[in-house]
């Protein structure tokens, strides 16, 4: 591949990590913010991750059920309010966390009167019910409810007719929705890097059934996408033209470190505080700790929070320990020509 392609590839903005909204974080919900991204990449990544999350995550589901004295689903059980079809629909809503990939057969046995709930499913140490309060059936005084359910581990949605295995005698097949993902939303907004505000910030919200944490789901979906795209890499990613490598100097340093603090577009008060502290470049700023900054004359919490927020959008922060900073021979009054000419 020609050298100018490598140059463009390396100079593209890449996300500096992702933030998790800790205030709303639960075992079944999380909000992630990824920024900055090149313009258009928010929709590209958000839509791709959403589709993979909804279609390709592994989970558990009931795949077959057997009721004592019942031969097919279009019938009823004596002194049970719901018919068999409704009971099966209720069973499909039971969510499990399975600790083995093997199919498991579980039993339900209860006499009336009363309600059968997911808590009545007799589990083992290999599986647990996540929504035990879910109602399954309503029993009359003379009802005797006995059932066996088969719980399997799989991916996506698999209807009965697409399953290859034959059912044991007396079992009724159940369409299986294995996916632990309940809902995925994404939103793209503007992100700022220096003076430019037309970069993307991707907000991704993930709801699960609790059997898989949202952070794990996003990591798995990203891994799947990476492996599916790997086949298109027909060139050596590690190749770097020697001439350009020399021009760039140390490739490990974030280019934003060499930008003027004026590019942060701070309030007048904050900008004057940095000027009084003789901080001219972002690299000189990020190595200062919060405590050091608060000792600066007229520098208060409001200015501190303003700077932290803007640095965070660039993937930087205060109190950073940066290997190789400042670069050998670098004169802040005469920044390298390469740094000045970069967009």
Swiss-Prot record:
Annotated keywords: DNA-directed RNA polymerase, Nucleotidyltransferase, Transcription, Transferase
UniProt-listed Enzyme Commission number(s): 2.7.7.6
Residue ranges, annotated region (Alpha C-terminal domain (alpha-CTD)): 253-343
Pfam families the record matches: RNA_pol_A_bac, RNA_pol_A_CTD, RNA_pol_L
SMART domains to which the protein is assigned, alphabetical: RPOLD
Enzyme class: transferase
Subunit structure, interactors included: Homodimer. The RNAP catalytic core consists of 2 alpha, 1 beta, 1 beta' and 1 omega subunit. When a sigma factor is associated with the core the holoenzyme is formed, which can initiate transcription.
The family this protein is said to belong to: Belongs to the RNA polymerase alpha chain family.
NCBIfam families: PRK05182.1-2 (NF003513), PRK05182.2-5 (NF003519), rpoA (TIGR02027)
Protein name per UniProt: DNA-directed RNA polymerase subunit alpha
Organism this protein belongs to: Bdellovibrio bacteriovorus (strain ATCC 15356 / DSM 50701 / NCIMB 9529 / HD100)
Biological classification of the source: Bacteria, Pseudomonadati, Bdellovibrionota, Bdellovibrionia, Bdellovibrionales
Protein's gene: rpoA
């Amino acid at each position: 591949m020609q050298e100018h392609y490598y140059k463009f590839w390396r100079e593209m903005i890449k996300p500096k990590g992702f933030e998790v909204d800790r205030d709303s974080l639960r075992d079944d919900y999380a909000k992630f913010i990824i920024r900055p991204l090149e313009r258009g990449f928010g929709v590209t990544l958000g839509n791709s991750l959403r589709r993979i999350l909804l279609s390709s995550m592994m989970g558990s589901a009931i795949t077959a059920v057997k009721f004592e004295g019942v031969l097919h689903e279009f019938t009823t059980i004596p002194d049970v309010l719901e018919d068999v079809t409704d009971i099966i629909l209720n069973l499909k809503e039971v969510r499990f966390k399975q600790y083995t990939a093997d199919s498991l057969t579980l039993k339900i046995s209860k006499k009336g009167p009363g309600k059968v709930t997911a808590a009545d499913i007799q589990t083992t140490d290999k599986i647990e019910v996540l929504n035990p309060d879910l109602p399954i059936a309503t029993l009359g005084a003379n009802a005797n409810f006995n059932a066996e359910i088969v719980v399997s581990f799989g991916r996506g949605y698999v209807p009965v007719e697409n399953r290859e295995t034959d059912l044991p005698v007396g079992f009724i097949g159940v369409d299986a929705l294995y996916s632990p993902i309940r809902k995925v939303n994404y939103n793209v907004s503007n992100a700022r890097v220096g003076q430019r505000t037309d970069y993307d910030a991707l907000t991704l919200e993930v709801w699960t059934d609790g059997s898989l944490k949202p952070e794990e789901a996003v990591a798995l979906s990203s891994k799947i996408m990476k492996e599916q795209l790997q086949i298109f890499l027909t060139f050596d990613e590690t190749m770097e033209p020697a001439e350009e490598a020399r021009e760039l100097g140390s490739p490990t340093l974030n280019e934003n470190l060499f930008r003027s603090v004026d590019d942060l577009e701070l309030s007048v008060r904050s900008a004057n505080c940095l000027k009084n502290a003789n901080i001219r470049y972002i690299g000189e700023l990020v190595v200062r700790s919060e405590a050091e900054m608060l000792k600066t004359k007229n520098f208060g919490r409001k200015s501190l929070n303003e700077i932290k927020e803007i640095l965070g959008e660039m993937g930087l922060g205060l109190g950073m320990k940066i290997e190789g900073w400042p670069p050998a021979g670098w004169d802040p009054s005469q920044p390298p020509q390469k740094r000045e000419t970069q967009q």
